[in-house]
């Protein structure tokens, strides 16, 4: 059975999450792929209008006082029929809550968490880790890729210290260094970590064919 691919993007406000999502879609969007983007906070930047205006991409805003629930995900699956869901997660909320939702037996039958990304601002990392460690550690621990944004704001010694702390929390994560938010698109475009999975592309094509045949 084809499962909806889920990518979760975590990080505090102004860490570069929305810019990253724009860059990720620009690099990995497959022809006829239907994507739903769930935005759980309102940042300084917005989803690129060229992305929002695509017929096969739907942007949904989740109010701050609301949560991503099993019911919401079932509704999205039923009414939007996405191939991929990208969640921009609220950095002040515990990722474990979302993890519990995604671990629901029925949700796991239709959704599959593929990649978790975490973006952090090098200039505020230590402050947040000291004061909000319980919230910050969870997304780092479960992330596949951690992006260190605003590297230009700190010296090399500080960068190495941050990387050391990250690897203590998550020894297997990939760490990418970015000079500033304006450089995120270039890094995503050039990195081999962000690619179109050929097996996903094939499964997607087969699923589109199956749906078309079913609708006849």
Can you say where each PLM-predicted feature lies in the sequence?
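Short, low-complexity, intrinsically disordered N-terminal peptides in bacterial proteins
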Residues: 1-2, 215
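Nucleotide-state-sensitive switch-loop elements of NTP-binding domains
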Residues: 2-10, 15, 19-115, 126
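Alpha-helix boundary/capping detector
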Residues: 39, 47, 124, 128, ...
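Short, hinge-like loop/turn segments at secondary-structure boundaries
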Residues: 53-56, 135-136, 192-195
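Structural signal for conserved beta-strand scaffold positions within catalytic alpha/beta enzyme cores
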Residues: 61-63, 118, 148, 176-179
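Residue-level detector of flexible, active-site-proximal loop/helix-junction positions
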Residues: 66, 123, 182
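Phosphate/Mg2+-binding loops and adjacent switch elements
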Residues: 89-165, 170
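C-terminal accessory "lid"/substrate-recognition subdomains
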Residues: 155-216
């Amino acid at each position: 059975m084809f499962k909806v691919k889920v990518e979760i993007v975590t990080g505090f406000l102004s860490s570069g999450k929305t810019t990253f999502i724009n860059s990720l879609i620009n690099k990995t969007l497959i022809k006829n792929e239907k994507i739903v983007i769930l935005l759980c906070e309102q940042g300084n930047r917005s989803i690129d209008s060229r992305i929002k205006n695509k017929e096969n991409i739907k942007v949904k805003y989740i109010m701050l006082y609301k949560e991503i629930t099993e019911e919401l995900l079932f509704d999205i699956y039923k009414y939007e029929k996405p191939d991929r869901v990208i969640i921009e997660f609220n950095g002040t909320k515990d990722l474990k809550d979302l993890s519990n939702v995604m671990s629901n037996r029925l949700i796991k039958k239709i959704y599959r968490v593929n990649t978790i990304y975490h973006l952090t601002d090098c200039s505020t990392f230590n402050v947040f880790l000291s004061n909000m460690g319980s919230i910050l550690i969870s997304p780092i621990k479960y992330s596949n890729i951690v992006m260190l944004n605003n590297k230009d704001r700190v010296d090399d010694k500080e960068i190495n210290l941050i990387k050391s702390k990250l690897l203590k929390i998550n020894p297997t994560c990939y760490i990418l260094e970015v000079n500033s938010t304006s450089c995120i698109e270039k890094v995503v475009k050039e990195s081999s970590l962000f690619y179109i999975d050929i097996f996903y592309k094939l499964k997607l094509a087969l699923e589109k064919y199956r749906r078309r045949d079913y609708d006849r």
